[in-house]
């Protein structure tokens, strides 16, 4: 069935703009482009569903900062909305992800996110490979946060502090898409 559908899909693609076909894209973060003063790595995944040039998706990213033998993980999730256009075998997608959640995992402190706002802007480029599509993209994160850190000291007292700040970093993504009607 797959072999028989390829010529039909190619005929349909010749009649339509490549951005007007429905597709599902899954991407993973492949590198971090920021935070020069800190040792940091990032990991993340993104899934998008695009129909008639409009997309909706979900992206999560974990930034791990290695600061003097303490690894702090900062995880953010966003709801993506995007638009897509294309020419011949290439597609271009741009969008913004609204922050759904932001939390920290600290080895020495209990953490509670008091407030967070922001999100991430992104763009992706796709290359048509028939039924599949190879994608690459760039995402810029910008999050304002207020995180409460607390721990019990050796004397039994609880030590708390608020960490207010702006988290900004950039990631590169690679992925694969599946095109259908």
Language-model features and meaning:
Residues 60, 96-98, 138-140:
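A mature extracytoplasmic/lumenal domain signature
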Residues 86-122, 129:
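Surface-exposed, polar helix/loop patches in the mature regions of secreted/periplasmic/lumenal proteins
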Residues 27-41, 59-77, 100-117, 144-167:
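Flexible, solvent-exposed loop segments that connect beta-strands
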Residues 1-15:
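Classical Sec-dependent N-terminal signal peptides that target proteins to the secretory pathway
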Residues 11-68, 171, 177-181:
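Short glycine/proline- and aromatic-enriched beta-strand/turn motifs that initiate or cap beta-hairpins
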Residues 12-20, 49-50, 83-92, 127-136, ...:
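Short loop/turn motifs that connect adjacent beta-strands in outer-membrane beta-barrel proteins
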Residues 24, 41-47, 52, 77-81, ...:
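Hydrophobic, lipid-facing positions within transmembrane beta-strands of outer-membrane proteins
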Residues 129, 140, 166-181:
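Outer-membrane beta-barrel "beta-signal"
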